């Protein structure tokens, strides 16, 4: 039986836009019939929705996740290979098609049957119902650090185990021996008593006719031989030799190119367009106005106003022509809006506290603060942030009256496909989507605006079109991490113990637990007020944890200093009843040699953050000289329950550290006269290689439920940096 909670689903960040994606191994029957023609070729047998075996005994994992550099596809393949007892050298992977057979059922199950335990016999029926819901909502999202901890742990492993049992079943019938006399290893079946053996491929066709078990037997941790190993990533060779396909590598016969510009002020409309100069330029084919896109499906608002695109015989010519367009846009009354005015609005709304919604309330806050010996207050602000994927949004599309085909890199292939069908007036079966490797996603590529813009342009010109955002357009037309202000008040008793904690912040997105603290503070009052702005927002790596991790861990340090306590010891005292959190905190302090004195001009800061099912402790060491700050070293410890691929987990944590440091040291989107001011890496910079710190990551395999790795490395680095300074 399995228990699903509504909070568990919501905390994955779906409602806020990040989302999760999981397929499921336990479904009514074996739905390979619906997907077989999409994923199999000559000599291949689809034994399970996630697994096929060819006549050369190669097993291919079919994975419902997009690959944007995180390496999850290799780790998921390890999980399948482990339970399949496969020879790693015979394993392959490919991304699942954008099809309802690979829709995510976890969200629907959480909403419909939160907290319900189902008897095993009922599970297939329940899952059949939930699959229809997930398919209808277009959920095939990669995000929320869910690939390994949900798709892998609960469904891909089960698929591998089920197929292994199916192969044993088929061999048992063919050989006329009991199933319990057959063993599996290295992609082969063995009957030791008779000396017979055969590759999986010999029985693949027969096994494909066997209904998979809804409760296959999974291995215990001590039995793992593939999981827990740092296997070479399957996608690296092609990325090194240049054969890996990204969306911008697509070339179609007769293809033309489009460059695009959207209204500078979100929500604006095009008032005047003079395209005479552009149309006179060599190679220009057309100039197209695109009305504000209409949202549909789960992804929310895809666009923030009108756009204009130039189509030409080369991308360079399209961009050059775009630059000479004479455009006049409406400002929607936002010409007086700036970053300063937005934060003034936040401050007013927090102070007024109108319709404040409570997240946590424990104890009597007024009484606790009245009894406190020391009171401490602070306000924190963080700006809007862009995603700045190294590969900007782009797509290639061919659209006719009765068909649309698109080549793209995105984080929700099924959702994008459904969105295209709805907005183009086509049936889903008339839309084909090919998803490719992404050069970064970070939440930006879960918004389908760039897909629909490309399709609209292609329909208008009647030819294949490749549309690419310039770096300026990418930065100016993002779905930003929200700017937030957060106000704190703390009370300390005569012994310097934290007895009261109050926090009010503007706007709540997801995950729900982001503003909560792990520390044992008897009186807590945490809540939020609404303070909407016109600036488009969306999922950004670690979602609300990126803001609240900075707020809470910075204020904890302020409280430690007010109490005259060491920040590490101050935290540790409040974690005595949370051994897993305390173990991470102790380990990171140990690995960083916390008690070692620092030289003049150098500092050290610590943070602890629980997010996406994982606990991460970080220590940052800095040098401050001449008004400049250098980050010298970052030590991280992660407890994600179990590391399927230790090197992959370390890479994700260190990637998150770099992303978080870039945001903390350089990242700031500012609003001037209602529009975004930044336009390139010249004014929206990132950590460069020569500025990158020495990083070391240590893993604790605690045996707890698996957590994520792609996002948890980001939230804690900013407060640790600030605390060090």
Task: Set out the residue ranges of the language-model regions.
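Cofactor-binding beta-sheet edge motifs in enzyme active sites
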Residues: 1-724
